[in-house]
């Protein structure tokens, strides 16, 4: 009798339920689900929606669609089933981080993006069952805003001694043998393990290639033991991690000081176990109750301030100045590369940059930063329009706000919206939204 087919969402739910109910279970025979047409097509649609840059082979989604998506997926499945599939080298791209530093992004070819995405679709429910509630980065139904709200709550619970941790080149330094061993604790399928190893090795001798669909899942898995170790102190402490960005909050008491020191020791031990070191120059234990006490987490500067209006103390978080500089630099570069475009098309590219930035940073105490960005973005767009019309200045009298935000369509929603605390809980994702 032929077994009835099940859709991908149901398959993922079944895998997750089995992983949750039997924490020691090792999954085997799941490679067959990766090479299924439904899995590969779902991974393809996710990759296409994200529309990343081409890999080293220059292949684009437009070319694949023109030649035939069915043939592309069929050839990929054939290679995977026959064992002839080989990942292509990553294309490296450097992204400025500010202060003269850069972050290296590894861009896989589209075919490799699809295969990695298919692996993630099948492995994700296995490891999601094991992951800690303290981990928020790149996980289904979780967000940076949820992590931010938990830190805010911790500060309002008077946990004012902060362990501010900086992991040195986290993604670049993770040992392959350690991450493969962690995958192997749950997955006993040699073909999957071999594929994961191939993807790691094609990125170099160490590290997890940033920019690949598999990297967030593996990065979370690498620190999962640390998450569970610190979770044992939850209640007295607050621990929140978003990929390699983490913070520990404890009461500013004698007991709290001991717990903070021990937490830092444990973080150092777990990081060393996977080949990563702590940046001792940037990692510190500080008191928010002392003058000048502040730390950085998820792009925000956190302070404990007293309201001049009510006299109450509260967690004050504002965007890092570097984040403001960075978004304005990106807008400038976009306009510099858009001189051949029509005004509305050039503005739409700017909107794609500032909309995401504003939606992320509009929580907390960001009113000043938001208005600063709005002013300078409008100024840059006006200057761009003046140059296109071969005029000087910024056209403050020539073009009204109705023209800039109406006819040109420049994004203008820079209002602060306080985070909805009722949504801190995890929201169930759909398949296409899971990567």
Model-assigned labels for residue ranges:
Residues 135, 206-210, 316, 332-346, ...:
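Short, solvent-exposed helix-loop connector elements
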Residues 385-435:
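Extended C-terminal regions of large enzymes
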Residues 72-75, 79-94, 98, 130-289, ...:
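Conserved polymerase palm-domain catalytic core
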């Amino acid at each position: 009798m032929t077994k009835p087919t099940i859709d991908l969402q149901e398959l993922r739910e079944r895998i997750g339920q089995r992983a949750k109910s039997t924490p020691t279970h090792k999954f085997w025979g799941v490679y067959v689900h990766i090479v299924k047409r439904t899995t590969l097509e779902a991974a393809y649609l996710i990759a296409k929606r994200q529309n990343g840059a081409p890999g080293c082979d220059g292949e684009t989604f437009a070319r694949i669609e023109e030649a035939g998506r069915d043939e592309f997926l069929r050839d990929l499945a054939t290679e995977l089933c026959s064992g002839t599939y080989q990942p292509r080298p990553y294309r490296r791209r450097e992204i400025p981080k500010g202060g003269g530093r850069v972050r290296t992004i590894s861009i896989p070819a589209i075919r490799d993006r699809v295969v990695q995405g298919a692996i993630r679709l099948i492995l994700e429910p296995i490891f999601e069952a094991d992951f800690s509630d303290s981990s928020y980065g790149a996980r289904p139904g979780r967000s940076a805003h949820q992590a931010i709200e938990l830190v805010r709550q911790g500060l309002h619970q008077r946990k004012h001694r902060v362990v501010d941790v900086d992991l040195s080149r986290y993604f670049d330094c993770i040992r392959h043998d350690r991450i493969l061993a962690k995958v192997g604790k749950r997955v006993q399928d040699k073909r999957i393990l071999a594929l994961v190893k191939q993807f790691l090795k094609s990125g170099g001798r160490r590290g997890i290639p940033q920019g690949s669909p598999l990297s967030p899942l593996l990065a979370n898995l690498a620190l999962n033991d640390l998450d569970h170790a610190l979770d044992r102190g939850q209640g007295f402490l607050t621990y929140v991690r978003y990929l390699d960005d983490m913070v520990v909050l404890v009461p500013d008491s004698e007991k709290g000081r001991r717990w903070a020191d021990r937490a830092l020791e444990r973080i150092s031990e777990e990081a060393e176990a996977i080949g990563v070191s702590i940046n001792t120059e940037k990692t510190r234990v500080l008191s928010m109750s002392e003058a000048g006490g502040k730390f950085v987490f998820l792009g925000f500067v956190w302070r404990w301030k007293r309201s001049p209006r009510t006299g109450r103390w509260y967690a004050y978080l504002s965007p890092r100045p570097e984040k403001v500089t960075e978004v304005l630099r990106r807008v400038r570069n976009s306009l510099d590369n858009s001189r051949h475009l029509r005004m509305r098309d050039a503005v739409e590219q700017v909107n794609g940059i500032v909309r995401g930035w504003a939606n992320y940073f509009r929580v907390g105490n960001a009113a000043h930063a938001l208005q600063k960005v709005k002013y300078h973005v409008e100024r840059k767009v006006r200057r761009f329009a003046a140059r296109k019309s071969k005029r000087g200045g910024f056209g403050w009298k020539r073009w009204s706000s109705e023209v800039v935000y109406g006819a040109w369509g420049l994004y203008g929603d820079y209002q602060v919206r306080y985070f909805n605390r009722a949504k801190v809980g995890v929201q169930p994702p759909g398949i296409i939204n899971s990567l």
